Swiss-Prot record:
Active site (catalytic residues): 67 (proton acceptor)
Reactions the enzyme catalyzes: Endonucleolytic cleavage of RNA, removing extra 3' nucleotides from tRNA precursor, generating 3' termini of tRNAs. A 3'-hydroxy group is left at the tRNA terminus and a 5'-phosphoryl group is left at the trailer molecule
Lineage, highest ranks first: Bacteria, Bacillati, Bacillota, Bacilli, Lactobacillales
Protein name, entry field: Ribonuclease Z
Organism: Lactiplantibacillus plantarum (strain ATCC BAA-793 / NCIMB 8826 / WCFS1)
EC number: 3.1.26.11
Length: 311
């Protein structure tokens, strides 16, 4: 599991940061990529990575401001040209279906794959299967905006083969039965319950990706105990009034959310073009004074989300 940042700027494309898009790489887990927001030029950014549009299975839109959605029609079209034929689902606020369908209709674009929509109006679980769950909650922005919490299911515990070998139980098909939790009767008459020889499950990972927002309790609940929190940091700590008026957050406000939620790392994005070079580093320092594991990410940064260490 990795996060790859395709655009980390705010408002409009800049020389050093494109507008918002974040890829959650789940290639090992399910051979898929999930995108969160698709700002203008996202497909150009993808060309500079190893990501393949045909691998994109889900797109989660936080809100319908242009710097988060203007790249959608082009990316959807290119996915057809590049061998994408598997269904793709777009999740987002009411209006995302109309935006996409209008752009495709007016441009005469025909997709080679089924396109589905799941429009959101309130906090809910938008997707869940045996391996992942995605839930959302509303944030505090000028228009309807949501944050997403991606939770990986726990990994089954490993079979404790060393304990079985200590009992003179040779490896073979019986190990597969025991790993499945079955009770097995051995040739010598002993009965072995597989459940007694399976280690505790390994906790799955949680990633929280927020849209544009002012401080809100929903940000904390979405991020609770997450392995990584992606939070906007449009302004520096001294611009609190400006951030409030424009429905955004400062570096220190984002860090306060991370601290309160008990996350493992805070990844700051949606950076105003005014913060370049040393000023960008200053944003990071501001956040680190509140929450030490803070990082201002740049376009094309790739962040590993490792499985928690086993106890």
């Amino acid at each position: 599991m990795q996060l790859e940042f395709l655009g980390t700027g705010a408002g409009s494309p800049g020389k050093f940061r494109n507008v918002t898009s974040t890829a959650l790489r789940l290639l090992d887990e399910r051979n898929e990529v999930w995108l969160f927001d698709v700002g203008e030029g996202t497909q150009h950014q993808i060309l500079r990575t190893t990501l393949k549009p045909r691998k994109i299975a889900k797109i989660f839109i936080t809100h319908l401001h242009g710097d988060h959605i203007f790249g959608l029609p082009g990316l959807l079209s290119s996915r057809s040209f590049q061998g994408g034929d598997e269904p793709l689902t777009i999740y987002g606020p009411v209006g995302v279906r109309d935006f996409v369908q209008t752009a495709l209709r007016v441009s005469g674009t025909h997709l080679s794959y089924p396109l589905k929509f799941h429009e959101i109006t309130k906090a809910e679980t938008v997707f869940e299967d045996a391996t992942f769950k995605v839930s959302c909650e509303p944030l505090d922005h000028r228009i309807a905006c949501f944050g997403y919490r991606v939770e990986e299911a726990d990994h089954p515990g490993e079979l404790q083969a060393d304990r079985l070998k200590a009992l003179n139980i040779p490896s073979g098909p019986v190990y597969g039965q025991l790993k499945a939790g079955k009770t097995v009767t051995l040739p010598d008459g002993r009965t072995i319950n597989g459940q007694d020889y399976i280690a505790a499950p390994q906790k799955g990972r949680t990633v929280t990706i927020l849209g544009d927002t002012r401080r809100t309790p929903h940000a904390v609940s979405l991020a609770q105990d997450a392995d990584a929190l992606v939070h906007e940091s449009t302004f520096g700590k001294d611009e609190g009034k400006l951030a409030h008026n424009y429905y955004h957050s400062t570096s220190t406000q984002a860090a306060q959310v991370a601290q309160q939620a008990g996350v493992k790392q805070l990844l700051l994005t949606h950076i105003s073009a005014r913060y370049t070079g040393k000023l960008s580093k200053e944003l990071q320092k501001q956040a680190q004074k509140v929450f030490s594991h803070s990082k201002v990410v740049r376009d094309f940064d790739v962040i590993d989300i490792p499985l928690p260490e086993k106890g």
